[in-house]
Amino acid sequence: MSLERATLWSILGAYLLLPASTVVDFPAFPPLDKVTISNVSAFFVCRFILGKRIKLLPNLGIGKILILIYITSPFMTAFLNPEPIIAGARFIKGMEYYDALSAIIRQSLFILPFILGFTFIRDSKTHEELLWVLAYAGLFYSLPMLFEVRFSPQLHTWVYGFFPHNFGQQMRGGGFRPVVFIGHGLLVAFFAMSSLVAVSTLWKLRKPIKGYSAGIISLYLGGVLILCKSFASLIYASLLVGLIQLASPKRQILVAKVLVLLVIFYPMLRAADWFPINNIYSIAAEFSEDRAQSLKFRLDNEEILLTHVRNKALFGWGSWGRNRVYDMESGKDLSVTDGRWIIVMGEYGWVGFLAEFCLLALPVIRSTKVIRYVKDRRERVVFGAITLLLAISIVDLLPNASVSPWTWLLAGALLGRIEQIKFRAKVRTTNLHTEFIDNER
């Protein structure tokens, strides 16, 4: 197995198979879970066992700046939050330099797949390999998913001895959402959607999968996705598969860019009270009153948390639950934090939010400038599909809280590919210029 393929499988395999909500907490070190352990293991093997040189920073200047801010901003958060929070009987200690160091280490561990991505998964061959890994992983994982759809989410309990989340949240429409080992049915549905998009791209490339048409397998994975009972993932799949099959890669990338810009500007519009909440609620109510009420509950909680963020807007409130809102008399937690964006903004403020989300969005935004240099049709199809997958992963961070190692790997891989395309275009231009001068002589 090649290094690139092993890197892809190690990050994705750990996400799919290791237990969710399991943490090993060492003193003076951030908690270790399946995300951080797999990230460190993959990095350690590549660097110290295989002896591969790993670039810690991309060539792109803005990328370097965003990484450094992402890693170091918790120091300022801790420095500006020394006071405790007292609400009724609840006491939350002030931030200390130990907390800053722990957060900086945690941020560094989270970003390791991004670094591995732009170091190793950076050419057309490895990008197509990425799609194959997603396709095979989706087919493999569909079996336990279908089992849990039929018999309820039991595998995590049987294998690891506990259930990682609220069981009631996995009950939908008289049946069950599969959970397997990822931790929540919505995350499983998003993975199924990603696998469907990968197989659909292989179908576009006319690549059979083990002798079977990728189109037939797309229909199968589409059926599995429907059984996951996630409306959002169905919308994502419909949009991405439709774009991949019907739109040019250039248009796909344009749509991806618009999506990530909307994600970045959404908190700004909410903070400025320019987001049309009432109009969106009215539209949702026309389709389903239950979904409209759920949306209103989510938006109301975001408003409560945004009001709290305004008191420490730049660098946030820090960890230990300081970003949440409590009743000052009873100490009761009044917060429901669903979206990743509001969690990051509450903990690390606007600086932390912009560092994380702009770093994830940077490859998508830059891709519009390099697609014209990709001449091969197959490479353009793959480039467009991966850009769309990354964009929709960023969009999903608005309603959901989990940014997976796979999302960071996608972002790093796309940034590495962009750097390679720009380098080759520069070399080609230099060679043409040299030939022109030689001919003139």
Question: What are these model-derived regions, one by one?
Answer:
Residues 112, 131-155, 159-160, 170-247:
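Alpha-helical transmembrane segments of multi-pass inner-membrane proteins
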Residues 184-186, 221-224, 230, 315, ...:
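A conserved mid-to-late transmembrane alpha helix and its immediate loop/hinge
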Residues 238, 242-245, 348-391, 418:
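Hydrophobic transmembrane alpha-helices and their immediate junctions
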Residues 143, 149-153, 228, 245-289, ...:
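A membrane-periplasm/extracellular boundary helix in multi-pass inner-membrane enzymes
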Residues 195-197, 258-263, 385-393, 397-441:
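Transmembrane alpha-helices of multi-pass inner-membrane enzymes
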Residues 3-26, 36-108, 393, 440-441:
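N-terminal hydrophobic segments of proteins, predominantly signal-anchor/transmembrane helices
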Residues 7, 58-70, 107-108, 116-147:
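Interfacial loop-to-transmembrane-helix boundary motif in multi-pass membrane proteins
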Residues 277-348, 367-374:
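Long extracytoplasmic/lumenal interhelical loops at the membrane interface
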